[in-house]
């Protein structure tokens, strides 16, 4: 059994269940170990994903939610939909490239009771995202999500690069930064 501490990349502290104490959200997805320049990253590991650990109020944390996200690297936590609870947005630097639509970004809308509804972005925006931030970039009072591109061609299988170029319709030139503007609907 693989412990969730393996491949830990980031964590966030927030009250995900609304009980007044701080819970912990952990990102596991480090796939750099064993990677060799010019070779595809090894297959995703079973511990990769997003975990939320509920605080019982006495600083005992129990895993209450898990979402598999191959190669997860970073996350931001905020009440993006304005409903009073904390949502999660996360990126993967090492997604499962063999999928028809590799998941490189996920937004997990908190539905309460430690249940989250996953949403993603259009496939023409799939890319090797290595940074994520939350900020009101257009000044409308709602927190948006900003994704930053990493230039790591050695991490992407050659056949997927060809498919990615065709999907994008821009000759494979993903934007360096994209803004996911909050429309106030989650």
Regions found by a protein language model. Give the residues of each.
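Beta-propeller-forming repeat regions
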Residues: 1-186
